[in-house]
């Protein structure tokens, strides 16, 4: 596995955990600036390696899920977060993208000298909220949540004294959504912590935590007694426009009673933005509230609309974070930690030093490639950085201060936890018909679940909320279970007895019974949750959902060849090999067999192959996926058109091949299939595709003109005269696309006994619904045999 890929996986796992603690628990374990650095690093790595981007990456989404204790609210306009700038050049690059991305008359949006005008305001460190007004009255308050769905905190926002319950003045739209930040001033934070200490209550680490925890209290009386404030920074949905510029919007909102930052300013071009940023940075400590940067937005709203959005953020706004903080210290030692996948990761142990107000004694080193890049030796004087007050990392060695006693950093030959052998990972790639093996950046303990560190992390992942969701099994409890040898694999969780649990620290009768019930309740997971819980390298929550939705059975997932897996959305060859290798491993198979056998797990949602996946194969696509040297999609299409079947391509003689392709490509194809291993591999892929129920689609030109061309059909419930697979095949032979979900674009729904939500939705949408008899009649009318 490449260093970049390994680091991406580490960053995603860490960011997911921090997202959960920040957005769901309101108990962040790291500063926001540290999160920003991790996110920025992940984003940069993914930009350099776009093939490694997956739907489950934190860069593809905002935040985490809303708490179920509050009513969920769907935002009509997504509450997106902002991209970040850490250096002045980042802001200049943002300005360049804005300038080049605009296609409007210069007089409409540029200031003096043709420079884009930006609004400038401090980035408050609080909790983003949405305030919805109807006819001037506050009717709802909501948190951002995951950007799409938040929490209804209406009763709590009403207690924030500077949020108007009724807008002042007149002229406001019938519907107006105001967005802003609820925060706590430095003085208010100090008063709150002092009063909490007096009554023996919980104190807060910083004003942001205090604001978030106060605003999301289930008891609004508690919120009312907290010194919360609000500052608006923009709009969501409105029934009418209220200004042509962002600053105009905020000035209008201020007239209607909304609190707006006193530091709001207009800047002509990027250099004035930088001057504003430097000024605020110098005055940062004297401000009455915490800020972690400055937000710049294109002021002209028409320009904002022209620039639009990316997946996670607007193109017309950016948050310029405060700079890195660095200090010198001594590297005392390098220790090695073992993660869930067995990765043995170096960690720097430092002579404690205060960086940006925080005492730092440890720093990440990522992997041994990073140690080599830095030229790091134990005893060195090193520069530690906390970018934007961030997580500590070693950024440089001061070589001229290296002592004579400095020692090289060496990877342990045996695991520091279990004593098993440590080996360097190997990356196996198949390209142009050949397999190549290269060394990865990661070292791994081969002990697997016999290694206590790996076992603990594997169980923590297995029981997590997005996996098997077994409540009551916290990290400390899992450590006890492993340390006392009560569990040796996830399967052992289902063998735990009441007598074993009640003896654990922190457990009594009620909590023991609750845990046993939670474990028992996890015996019927969805296929997607189970796949995710297995902890397959590179398989996050979204990839697990894709596997479950497309292959629809664990057996197919286990058997799937890497080339077959690449037919799935967003599954590249490297990830496909990781999945295939995981299920090829005998130890992993034994654990899965135990879970599904003696432990009694019953996977839900297994059944027929996903309709879109089943119809996604073409002969030319298969040929292309073989990675024959010099043969791309165009040549693959010519081969499919000429020969019609894979076997005909494999057995084609030189003359036929030369009549189809240029000499170089023809020779490459013949040489490829003359290697018996390649020919057999191709046959195996085709056989598995057919065994799974996939089939070659005709080219679009052959579908046009068929009676059901352009129509989308959905099959739901059971059929008696023919299987759904057969019905699907017959409909597709008539040109129809058979989908697994109902939408407004669906033409006809065939509903048999047991049809559920799909039938309900079809009726709600007023779609044509046929029973089995009507389907058979329709097929017969179109000349398709039904017996």
From Swiss-Prot:
Q: Which CDD domains match?
A: BRCT_DNA_ligase_like (cd17748), LIGANc (cd00114)
Which cofactor does this sequence's record say it needs? Mg(2+); Mn(2+)
Any keyword Ribonucleoprotein?
no
Determine the domain of life of the protein's source: Bacteria
Report the leader peptide range: none
The enzyme's E.C. designation: 6.5.1.2
Q: Which family does it belong to?
A: Belongs to the NAD-dependent DNA ligase family. LigA subfamily.
Name this polypeptide is given: DNA ligase
Provide the species name: Pseudomonas syringae pv. tomato (strain ATCC BAA-871 / DC3000)
In the UniProt record, what gene is named as encoding this protein? Answer: ligA
């Amino acid at each position: 596995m490449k260093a970049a890929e390994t680091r991406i996986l580490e960053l995603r796992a860490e960011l997911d955990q921090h997202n959960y603690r920040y957005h769901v628990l309101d108990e962040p374990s790291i500063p926001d600036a540290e999160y920003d650095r991790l996110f920025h690093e992940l984003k940069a790595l993914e930009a350099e390696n776009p093939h490694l981007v997956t739907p489950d990456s934190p860069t593809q989404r905002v935040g985490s899920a809303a708490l179920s204790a509050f009513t969920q609210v769907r935002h009509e306009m997504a509450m997106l977060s902002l991209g970040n700038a850490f250096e002045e050049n980042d802001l200049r690059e943002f300005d360049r993208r804005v300038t080049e991305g605009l296609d409007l008359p210069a007089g409409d949006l540029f200031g003096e000298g043709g420079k884009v005008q930006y609004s400038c305001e401090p980035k408050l460190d609080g909790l983003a909220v949405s305030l919805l007004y109807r006819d001037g009255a506050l009717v709802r308050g909501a948190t951002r949540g995951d950007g799409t769905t938040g929490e209804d905190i209406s009763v709590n926002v009403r207690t924030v004294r500077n949020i108007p319950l009724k807008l002042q003045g007149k002229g406001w739209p019938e519907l107006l959504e105001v967005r802003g930040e609820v925060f706590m001033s430095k003085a208010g934070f100090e008063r709150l912590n002092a009063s909490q200490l007096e009554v023996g209550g919980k104190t807060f680490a910083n004003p942001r935590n205090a604001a978030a925890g106060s605003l999301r209290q289930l008891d609004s009386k508690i919120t009312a007694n907290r010194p919360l404030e609000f500052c608006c920074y923009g709009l969501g949905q409105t029934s009418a426009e209220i200004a042509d510029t962002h600053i105009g919007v905020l000035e209008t909102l201020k007239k209607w009673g909304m609190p707006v930052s006193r530091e709001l300013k207009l800047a002509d071009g990027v250099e004035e933005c930088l001057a504003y940023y430097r000024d605020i940075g110098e005055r940062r400590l004297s401000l009455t509230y915490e800020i972690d940067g400055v937000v710049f937005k294109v002021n002209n709203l028409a320009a904002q609309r022209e620039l639009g959005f990316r997946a996670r953020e607007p193109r017309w706004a950016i948050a310029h974070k405060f700079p890195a903080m660095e200090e010198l210290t001594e590297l005392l030692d390098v220790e090695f930690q073992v993660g869930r996948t067995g990765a043995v990761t170096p960690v720097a142990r430092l002579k404690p030093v205060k960086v940006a107000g925080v005492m730092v004694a440890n720093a990440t080193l990522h992997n041994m490639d990073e140690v080599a890049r830095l030229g790091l030796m134990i005893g060195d004087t090193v520069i530690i950085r906390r970018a934007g007050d961030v997580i500590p990392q070693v950024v440089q060695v001061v070589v001229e201060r290296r002592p004579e006693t400095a020692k090289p950093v060496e990877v342990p030959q045996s695991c520091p936890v279990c004593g098993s052998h440590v080996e360097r990972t190997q990356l196996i790639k198949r390209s142009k018909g050949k397999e190549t093996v290269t060394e990865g950046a990661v070292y791994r303990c081969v002990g697997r679940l016999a290694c206590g560190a790996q076992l603990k992390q594997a169980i923590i992942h297995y029981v997590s909320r997005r996996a098997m969701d077994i409540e009551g099994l916290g990290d400390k409890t899992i450590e006890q279970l492993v340390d006392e040898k009560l569990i040796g694999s996830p399967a052992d969780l289902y063998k735990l007895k009441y007598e074993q649990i009640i003896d654990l620290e922190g457990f009594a009768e009620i909590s023991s019974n609750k845990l046993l019930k939670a474990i028992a309740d996890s015996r019927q997971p969805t296929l997607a949750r189970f796949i995710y819980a297995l902890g397959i390298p590179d398989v996050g929550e979204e990839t697990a959902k894709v596997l479950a939705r497309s292959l629809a059975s664990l057996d197919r997932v286990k058997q799937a060849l890497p080339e077959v897996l690449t037919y799935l959305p967003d599954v590249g060859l490297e990830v496909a090999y990781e999945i295939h290798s995981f299920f090829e491993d005998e130890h992993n198979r034994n654990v899965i067999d135990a879970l599904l056998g003696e432990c009694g797990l019953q996977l839900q949602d297994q059944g027929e192959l996903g309709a879109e996946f089943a119809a996604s194969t073409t002969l030319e696509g298969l040929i292309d996926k073989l990675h024959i040297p010099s043969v791309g999609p165009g040549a693959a299409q010519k081969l499919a058109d000429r020969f019609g079947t894979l076997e005909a391509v494999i057995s084609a003689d030189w003359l036929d091949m030369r009549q189809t392709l240029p000499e170089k490509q023809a020779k490459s194809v013949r040489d490829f299939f003359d290697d018996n291993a390649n020919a057999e591999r191709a046959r195996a892929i085709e056989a598995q595709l057919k065994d799974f129920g996939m089939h070659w689609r005709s080219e679009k030109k052959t579908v046009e003109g068929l009676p059901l061309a352009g129509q989308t059909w959905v099959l739901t419930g059971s059929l008696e005269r023919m299987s759904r697979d057969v019905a699907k095949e017959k409909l597709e032979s008539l040109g129809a696309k058979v989908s697994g979900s109902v939408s407004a674009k669906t033409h006809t729904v065939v509903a048999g006994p047991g049809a559920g939500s799909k039938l309900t939705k079809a009726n709600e949408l007023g779609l044509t619904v046929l029973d089995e008899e009507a389907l058979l009649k329709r097929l017969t009318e179109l000349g398709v045999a039904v017996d």
